[in-house]
């Protein structure tokens, strides 16, 4: 289906939407929230035997990718993916430690700290590049 000539004005507006830098970062944050919720639902789905977490898993992942489809119109893919996966990894690890009582070893915590440093560095690099 060729959506370029799709008569629905909502589709046309979505196609034309290119987020500002602030909107792109906000959408990226929203994508991370959806991805983390989806990942928690993956754990709660118990191998897709629990219906609600299984459905929420797919819905949240779809929403995360939908947000990122707009983010990459403004931010570099390398920055988008690194921040998305880095922050998502840290948030998921923290939830794992807290909610699922997973072990929080010194090595795990140091590695999570390194991820945070990397995400801050990438965020700074993208802001320097934009100015």
Give names to the regions the model predicted:
Residues 2-131:
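Polytopic alpha-helical membrane proteins, predominantly small-molecule transporters/carriers
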